[in-house]
């Protein structure tokens, strides 16, 4: 975890102090459950719940000998207690404490992620509504296609982000599960009721079945969902980067007073935040492979997953949280240039209206093949003009004039019918209906 890419609230969940505090929370829940079952007296339960404490430095000192951080933790806590310490960590195994504590930490962390996703969705929705009718050129393969609106672009992003909210709700069900089932998961030394009570105290569900650990397909699902979320965020960031290119310049990241873009070129205003998001998304996705490989543990458990999770889980949550907040800020403060969008629309010389013309000809009796051939032939002439450097002066009249001078078209379409094809409103007439689908 790098401080540079971490928000305080999420970072606070993934440090040694919080980890052992959560271990202690789980252990106290187990003690309370034993007490509820009549196995630990009220006085001992009360003493443990009130007095149990730990010291990080002492845990580290003990671990030098034990080579086992959970035993170092339980030993340290026992030192803070009296005779009642014999009931601390009673009848359970290390993974009962560790995995159940991890469920608590992941649940809290995922709630922060869900909050970030909701914020991003709302920001995209608001900016989409703001630019519902802002005309721009749509691009496929990076090449001009047909007129669209910038609002449609943002609405598409918003709808995709909303899907992640549904996926994360399901993932929350998978990860908010505890297990207090003993060394082999067979409840030999602790009844099922102990697990149900302890997990209930902690606000967790119980796994239907476990061995020594909670099964890692749950963790892998989480990693994959965060990777998918990152890919969607990267898609947004990459599109912003393209739209900010000097020759496009339809949007721009906010550039604050005193900000610098280059140590060598004073004129530079770069999409550095979107580039940063792109890089963070690569980091997030990089954890999917080791988390998937953690699913296949030996028999009732081996420890190969542990080192992976010590790296992956904190970084997955912290980086995803930061990515969301940064992207939300980029969208919220994004500067949009509608005039440049209109200028770029005109740069096609009117080619963006080619399909409209194509679809009018068959209505007049011409075959689709002949229609396509005539329209494409005229379009290729415009490309030849544009190849000669006429982009800077291009407007809709280039293609329109070519069509108006084509004797073959005149047999099927009169001048007013041809001119009617060059109408931006034709391409935006359903935007309102689309928005109603997306946003209700």
Curated annotation (Swiss-Prot):
Transmembrane segments: none annotated. One of its GO terms (biological process) is 'de novo' IMP biosynthetic process. N(6)-(1,2-dicarboxyethyl)-AMP binds at residues 4-5, 67-69, 93-94, 212, 263, 268-270, 276, 307-311. It catalyses: N(6)-(1,2-dicarboxyethyl)-AMP = fumarate + AMP; (2S)-2-[5-amino-1-(5-phospho-beta-D-ribosyl)imidazole-4-carboxamido]succinate = 5-amino-1-(5-phospho-beta-D-ribosyl)imidazole-4-carboxamide + fumarate. Catalyzes two reactions in de novo purine nucleotide biosynthesis. Catalyzes the breakdown of 5-aminoimidazole- (N-succinylocarboxamide) ribotide (SAICAR or 2-[5-amino-1-(5-phospho-beta-D-ribosyl)imidazole-4-carboxamido]succinate) to 5-aminoimidazole-4-carboxamide ribotide (AICAR or 5-amino-1-(5-phospho-beta-D-ribosyl)imidazole-4-carboxamide) and fumarate, and of adenylosuccinate (ADS or N(6)-(1,2-dicarboxyethyl)-AMP) to adenosine monophosphate (AMP) and fumarate. Homotetramer. Residues from neighboring subunits contribute catalytic and substrate-binding residues to each active site. This is Adenylosuccinate lyase. The lineage of its organism: Bacteria, Pseudomonadati, Campylobacterota, Epsilonproteobacteria, Campylobacterales.
């Amino acid at each position: 975890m790098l401080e540079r890419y971490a928000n305080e609230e999420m970072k606070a969940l993934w440090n040694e102090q919080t980890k052992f505090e959560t271990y202690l929370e789980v252990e106290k829940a187990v003690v309370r459950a034993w007490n509820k079952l009549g196995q630990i007296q009220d006085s001992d339960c009360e003493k443990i719940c009130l007095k149990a404490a730990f010291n990080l430095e002492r845990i580290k000192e003990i671990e030098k000998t034990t080579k086992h951080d959970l035993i170092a933790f339980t030993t340290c806590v026992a030192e803070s207690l009296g005779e009642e310490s014999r009931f601390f960590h009673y009848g359970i195994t290390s993974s009962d404490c560790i995995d159940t504590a991890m469920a608590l930490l992941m649940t809290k962390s995922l709630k922060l992620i869900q909050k970030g996703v909701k914020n991003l969705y709302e920001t995209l929705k608001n900016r989409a509504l703001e630019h519902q009718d802002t005309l721009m050129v749509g691009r496929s393969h990076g090449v001009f296609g047909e007129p669209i609106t910038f609002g449609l672009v943002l609405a598409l992003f918003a709808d995709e982000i909303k899907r992640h909210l549904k996926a994360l709700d399901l993932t929350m069900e998978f990860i908010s599960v505890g297990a207090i089932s003993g060394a082999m998961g067979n409840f030999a030394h602790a009844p099922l009721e102990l697990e149900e009570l302890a997990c209930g105290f902690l606000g967790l569900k119980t796994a239907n079945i476990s061995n020594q650990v909670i099964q890692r397909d749950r963790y892998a699902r989480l990693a994959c969902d965060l990777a998918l979320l990152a890919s969607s965020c990267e898609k947004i960031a990459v599109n912003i980067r393209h739209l900010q290119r000097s020759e496009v310049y339809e949007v721009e990241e906010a550039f604050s007073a005193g900000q610098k873009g280059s140590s060598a070129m004073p004129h530079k205003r770069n999409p550095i935040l979107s580039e940063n998001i792109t890089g963070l998304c690569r980091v997030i996705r990089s954890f999917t492979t080791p988390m998937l490989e953690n699913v296949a543990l030996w028999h009732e458990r081996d420890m190969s997953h542990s080192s992976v999770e010590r790296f992956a889980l904190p970084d997955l949550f912290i980086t995803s949280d930061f990515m969301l907040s940064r992207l939300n800020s980029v969208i919220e403060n994004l500067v949009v240039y509608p005039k440049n969008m209109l200028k770029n629309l005109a740069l096609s010389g009117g080619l963006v209206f080619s399909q409209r013309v194509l679809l009018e000809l068959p209505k007049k009796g011409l075959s689709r093949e002949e229609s396509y051939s005539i329209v494409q032939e005229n379009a290729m002439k415009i490309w030849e003009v544009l190849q000669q450097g006429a982009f800077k002066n291009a407007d809709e009249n280039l293609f329109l004039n070519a069509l108006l001078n084509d004797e073959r078209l005149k047999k099927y379409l009169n001048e007013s019918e041809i001119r009617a094809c060059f109408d931006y409103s034709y391409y935006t007439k359903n935007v309102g209906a689309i928005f109603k689908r997306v946003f209700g």
